[in-house]
UniProtKB/Swiss-Prot annotation:
Binding positions for [4Fe-4S] cluster 2 per the UniProt entry: 215, 270, 480, 484
Gene3D superfamilies: Fe-only Hydrogenase (Larger Subunit), Chain L, domain 3
Protein name (Swiss-Prot/TrEMBL): Cytosolic Fe-S cluster assembly factor NAR1
Record-stated family: Belongs to the NARF family.
């Protein structure tokens, strides 16, 4: 099992092997009665525990067992763990393994496909499987590698899985993808961004920059270690949160099914999504059910399909025929494309909205921070006035995430009460670098004015200076390096088998894991990765159990047959200081028009209809349907002694 780095890095018992022993004692909030006397604990032959009074009752001088009371067994569930900062690898990792392909197989066995007339009380639950596009891309890459065939297009693979699982003997599943839910999440993110921006422009206290919250690993880290930054997190539900609400609240109502009469499963690229599904905001106390009953990782879905006998290369009728509206198989448009990143395109959606709403033409300028494609800044510049109207960033991986936390704390003042002595020196160094850039920029401009194309370079160089002073407006944050396509639950690359069988590691899903467990194999100068050896040349920390080549392959398949996102800018002479100017107008850039049908516009209309059907004009219902809340976790271990995670010295 592979949690994101943001989850495991914050805990003191990070190197302990998984254990069922929780380090936090179970609290008993029940107050003893005032007239209670001394008691003893008795254990019977069946290992049941009883509390027995040592005072004999009237008329029972020799019988002290008449007042015994059965004791309830103390239990710790996933909700308790999410509200505790004591550990994460030792308890939650065991509890979330209960959500696996074995649970789905058991459900298929016990859930009748038709109503039993002799058992009218036992109504079968309607099974729904929602698959993320990152999962489909990873499965396609794995199937192509195993069979030496071309990758299966995502739409074709989705429909083959749907046709297979819809068979009665396989469970009669409804199989969807999650891109329409992502579309609704992106729309809500734009609405929330405007709300915050309007508050800021009116001079009110606004929680800026807005930080994307679709990554549960980042959210869990923020709640447990960076609680002061929670107001900055976007309240918009992730695609999983919204598809869960759609399945239980909207689709179930259309079919006259109560929420507890639907069994909803999602297939996601990471284990952390299991934690997200267990949050209290996604639980209905009225029906005692969650929006998502079980979360499978990509690897677990693959194991499930294997056990059921799925052959991904068996074609079905009309598998490649595009659909432009909701069908009987899927009530939502299939596999919507959102230009930007394979991790949800949250930043790109905000950028497009800013460009459309700005009165003048704009250009996008990008810069890789320290040459990393996982840490890129985006500036939107007014081409007429030269003003920087927006500054955003894409931040993937825990190392970059920590730098982001420090940067945001510096810009906003959040969580800076405990600044160390070195903070002032760092600020002075940053200020000196900015002064140097400002004085050097005019010289660079005048020295290159005669060269062809240097007007663009000069603008980019000057924009770098003004961009340094501009504060962040929005950040797309993901805990995994490479984003969601490199999630811990994705399919893993095939590697050479070592000669000694005992040298091969096997993870919980049964996959062989010969790669070093704390790095990514990177070929050097075209050489081999030396997989299976004790060391790997050019190993990059963070991309656990994967390689850059494999992640790039999954990324490529993700966009196969879809509009390709803008490539990361190369560091060339025409790309001064790592900036790549891209001139854009205010026209729509990410619309999908097929046979005269704008799929995104069509999806916008469907989203509005669904929200109105579920919420009506009730703003409170709409908020609960589309958004969520975050809660700062007060540490039972560290904070009780006045020590924070950041103050711990290793």
């Amino acid at each position: 099992m592979a949690f994101s780095g943001a989850l495991t890095i914050t805990d003191l018992d990070d190197f302990l092997t998984p254990s069922q022993a929780c380090i936090i004692p179970v609290r008993n909030n029940k107050k003893p009665a005032e007239d209670e006397g001394p008691t003893e604990i008795h254990i019977d032959s069946n290992n049941n525990y009883y509390e027995v009074s040592t005072y004999p009752s009237v008329g029972h001088d020799d019988d002290i067992g008449n007042s015994k009371k059965a004791l309830e067994k103390a239990e710790i569930n996933l909700n308790d763990c999410l509200a505790c900062s004591g550990c994460i690898t030792s308890t939650e990792s065991l509890l979330i393994t209960m959500q696996s392909q074995n649970e789905i197989l058991e459900f298929i066995k016990t859930n009748p496909t038709v109503v039993d007339p002799e058992s009218p009380c036992h109504k079968p639950r309607l099974p729904i499987l929602s698959i993320s596009p990152q999962t489909l891309a990873s499965l396609s890459a794995a199937y192509a590698t195993a069979s030496s065939r071309p990758p299966i297009p995502l739409l074709v693979l989705l429909r083959r899985i749907r046709a297979f699982l819809s068979q009665p003997e396989k469970g009669s599943w409804r199989v969807w993808d999650t891109t329409f839910a992502r579309h609704m999440s992106l729309r809500e993110s734009v609405v929330e961004f405007h709300e915050r921006k309007d508050k800021k422009e009116k001079g009110k206290a606004a929680e800026m920059p807005m930080l994307a919250s679709a990554c549960p690993g980042w959210v869990c880290y923020a709640e447990k270690a960076q609680g002061d930054m929670l107001p900055l997190l976007s309240a918009a539900r992730s695609s999983q949160g919204i598809i869960g609400a759609l399945a239980k609240s909207w689709y179930g109502h259309k079919l006259q099914h109560k929420p507890d009469e639907i069994y909803h499963v999602t297939a996601m690229p990471c284990y952390d999504k299991k934690l997200e599904a267990s949050r209290s905001d996604f639980y209905s106390s009225l029906y005692s059910t969650r929006d998502v009953d079980c979360v499978l990782t990509t690897g677990e879905l693959d194991l499930l399909l294997q056990e059921l006998g799925f052959d991904p290369h068996v074609p079905i009728a009309n598998e490649s025929t595009p659909s432009y509206s909701a069908t009987e198989d899927s009530p939502f448009p299939e596999l919507l494309t959102h230009e930007g990143s394979s991790s949800g395109s949250y930043l790109q959606t905000i950028i497009h909205d800013v460009q459309r709403s700005h009165p003048n033409p704009t250009r996008i300028i990008t810069r890789e921070i320290r040459g990393s494609t996982d840490n890129i800044e985006y500036l939107i510049q007014d081409t007429i006035t030269g003003q920087i109207v927006f500054k955003g960033a894409k931040v993937y991986g825990f190392r970059n995430l920590q730098n982001l936390v420090r940067k945001v704390a510096k810009e906003t003042g959040i969580g800076r009460s405990g600044r160390g002595a070195g903070a002032g020196k760092l600020s002075a160094a940053v200020a000196a670098r900015r002064r140097k850039a400002k004085t050097a920029a005019p010289a660079a401009t005048s020295a290159t004015t005669s060269a062809e194309g240097t007007d663009v370079e000069s603008i980019a160089s000057l924009s770098l200076v003004s961009g340094e002073d501009k504060k962040l407006d929005f950040v797309e944050v993901m805990a995994c390096p490479g984003g969601c396509v490199n999630g811990g639950g994705q399919m893993k690359p095939t590697v050479p088998t070592p000669s000694a069988p005992e040298a091969m590691e096997v993870d919980e899903e049964g996959y062989q894991r010969p790669l070093p467990d704390d790095g990514v194999a990177v070929a050097v100068n075209g050489g081999s990765n030396n997989v299976g050896t004790g060391t790997v040349a050019g190993m990059e920390e963070g991309m656990r159990w994967s390689t850059k080549e494999w992640v790039a392959k999954v990324e490529d398949i993700y966009w196969t047959g879809l509009p390709t996102p803008p490539a990361s800018p190369p560091l060339t002479a025409s790309n001064v200081n790592g900036f790549a100017p891209q001139v854009k107008t205010n026209g729509t850039t990410n619309g999908q028009v097929n046979n005269g049908v704008d799929r995104n516009l069509q999806s916008d209309q469907l989203a509005e209809e669904i929200i109105h059907e579920v919420c009506g004009d009730d703003a409170s219902k709409r908020w609960d349907f589309m958004r969520t809340r975050f809660r700062k976790v007060e540490s039972d271990v560290l904070s009780s002694g006045g020590v924070t995670h950041e103050a711990v010295k290793w």
